[in-house]
Regions:
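Polytopic alpha-helical membrane proteins, predominantly small-molecule transporters/carriers
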Residues: 1-290
Length: 290
């Protein structure tokens, strides 16, 4: 469980960094690009990827995990870009809701792809998880009608984040080979993001570089602990998918209330309570009823 807790803490720290980035003159797109360079370095020096004596391109061509490398390497930066467009055309509240409700996809995958056993406590936990998410995401402020571009952006966010979660579970199943998978994934993601920025002819800034270093450290350990959590709960992916999503939004809500003075309604606090109850059901209820 400690891996999941560390992953949640790192993820919320990433959110806090992105929240204060613009006030510090950090261009988020540039920070994301530099973040991948840091992640590549940490993967190489800490995880020591094993290419089995092959060159980078040879390993990429021969590995059975190449589809995962390519999918994650493209999706990680692309979904970020889609998220920024969704925020622009549909608003941050709707975009955040789409990201959180993407939990539906990995939950379905847990039982269809990863063959997790569906028990009554898990059904209760899943239902409570979505009730909690809806309550936390409930906002009283009125929003304008969403445009067609906004709808496409929200669908992209929902599908993209859900697919990334499923792919990281596949990475976790690779066992000791996951350091190599992460190294290649980050390398491909860096290429995609830097290509995007060069095509935009972005003006590079020092604050963005510094922010990218910090972001890279936090993001690397967020992903590392998330994968290790999946390996620890190999037979219970629902707990990791739901626990990560719920934990991030609950801690993020509390952090926003206490550090950024964000207004949290009673129904939001009720959602936090229900969400924590969902994690209890997913982790403990099976053991209690056994």
């Amino acid at each position: 469980m400690h891996n999941l807790i560390f992953a949640i803490l790192c993820s919320v720290a990433v959110s806090v960094l992105l929240k204060v980035a613009r006030k510090k003159n950090i261009i988020i797109e540039q920070a994301i690009a530099f973040n991948y360079i840091v992640a590549i370095s940490l993967s190489y020096f800490l995880l020591k990827p094993d290419f089995k004596g092959l060159e980078f391109t040879e390993y990429l061509a021969q590995s059975d995990s190449t589809p995962i490398f390519l999918a994650l390497g493209i999706l990680l930066p692309t979904v970020f870009i889609i998220m920024s467009k969704a925020v622009e055309f549909a608003g941050i509240v709707r975009s955040d809701a789409a990201q959180r409700l993407s939990l539906f996809l990995p939950i379905v995958a847990s039982f269809i792809i990863f063959h997790e056993t569906l028990s009554q406590p898990k059904i209760v936990g899943i239902i409570l998880a979505f009730i909690g998410l809806f309550c936390i995401l409930n906002k009283s402020n009125e929003q304008s009608a969403v445009t067609f571009k906004g709808i496409l952006g929200l669908i992209g966010v929902w599908f993209g984040y859900g697919t990334i979660d499923i792919l990281f579970k596949q990475v976790a199943k690779s066992g000791g080979a996951f350091p190599t998978t992460l190294f290649i994934t980050f390398s491909l993601a860096a290429c995609v993001m830097f290509l995007y920025l060069f095509l935009k002819r972005t003006q590079w800034t020092v604050p963005s570089f510094i922010g990218g270093i910090i972001l890279g450290v936090l993001n690397f350990f967020n992903i590392l602990f998330y994968i290790k959590a999946h390996q620890s709960f190999g037979q219970n992916p629902t707990l990791v998918f739901a626990g990560m999503n719920i934990g991030v939004i609950c801690l993020g809500t509390i952090t926003g209330a206490f550090f950024f003075k964000e207004k949290i309604s009673q129904i939001n606090w009720f959602g936090v309570f229900i969400s924590l109850s969902a994690i209890f059901c997913l982790y403990y209820l099976d053991k209690i009823l056994a």
